Amino acid sequence: MTIPAFGLGTFRLKDDVVIASVKTALELGYRAVDTAQIYDNEAAVGQAIAESGVPRNELYITTKIWIENLSKDKLIPSLKESLKKLRTDYVDLTLIHWPSPGDAVSVEEFMQALLEAKKQGLTREIGISNFTIPLMEKAIAAVGADNIATNQIELSPYLQNRKVVDWAKAHGIHITSYMTLAYGKALKDEVIARIAAKHNATPAQVILAWAMGEGYSVIPSSTRRENLASSLLAQDLHLDAEDKNAIAALDCNDRLVSPEGLAPAWD
């Protein structure tokens, strides 16, 4: 099963806000939803999905294992808890949200526990998030590249993460981009605005289309119906070589997500 190119993110959305966002998105035609244990919204996402009436087999649900649940005795029980909250027997994709700080739990231990969850049918696919090249090497050594469906990383026009992307691609690991719009900062960029005007599109559509054109999956979030609908249209926008070169030139290694005590030594 391939990871959908386009999905809904739910980071920082909770309770009624996330329920409304997910229900609206599903109504508009979204079929992939990304959540995580630490977002504290899995139960709300599960409720929204249940109330939407969309059949489970049409959906692609992703969750992520938090660092406190990485040890082999905690990972599977924590995932079962997530499934209960999400009101489903399985998720389509489970990611390791962040590598274990200070290597408290080895990559080998948590990747093998995650692979066991896959063997038990709790998750269809497994993957990683916020992994550097040395960490990807360890993950591959633990479970094989064939078992790593994606590396979900911060990736925007300002942080194009080429080194990690190229290494992942060379080893057959798909990339999912989060923070694709750089917290909305990239929406104000003059270069993006120019490309948007040229295509009669919005800046958000241009950035999402650029990322998908590079082969990445995207998971933008919004609480507004018009933005959710507008973002969907990015799938129909195709940028030309001139546009792509202009966006490539915006890369300035501007990383926005690097929590102290959690972030690895970035490549």
UniProtKB/Swiss-Prot annotation:
Pfam family of this protein, just one?
A: Aldo_ket_red
Q: What top-level class of enzyme does the UniProt entry assign?
A: oxidoreductase
Q: Which reaction does it catalyse?
A: hydroxyacetone + NADP(+) = methylglyoxal + NADPH + H(+)
Q: Origin, by domain of life?
A: Bacteria
One GO cellular component term noted in the UniProt record for this chain: cytoplasm
* A GO term for molecular function: aldo-keto reductase (NADPH) activity
User: Which family does the UniProt entry place this protein in?
Assistant: Belongs to the aldo/keto reductase family.
Its assembly, as annotated, is:
Monomer.
**Any idea what this protein is called?**
Methylglyoxal reductase DkgB
